[in-house]
Amino acid sequence: MKIGFIGFGNMAQALAHGLVRGKAVEAGNIGACARDRAKLQRNTEPHGFRAFDDAASVAEFADIVVVAVKPY
């Protein structure tokens, strides 16, 4: 199963790490996109998560998509 996050702030990162620690999903099967590409790469690459440029790419990659953005 592949899980994608639209938005990868503190809550999304906590969920992603918990899924990997709990052995529910392998790190390579987690992908995310966010507004700040540099920050996204800093928060994904060291952990083996995949970084995407946009929400459409995340949706194409994932079986499950989590929308983790603030409701501005």
Where are each of the predicted segments found?
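N-terminal Rossmann-like NAD(P) cofactor-binding module of classical short-chain dehydrogenase/reductase
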Residues: 65-66
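Active-site beta-alpha loop architecture of Rossmann-like, nucleotide-cofactor-dependent enzymes
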Residues: 72
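NAD(P)+-binding Rossmann beta1-loop-alpha1 motif at the extreme N-terminus of oxidoreductases
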Residues: 1-56, 60
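Glycine-rich, N-terminal phosphate-binding loop of Rossmann-like dinucleotide-binding domains
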Residues: 69
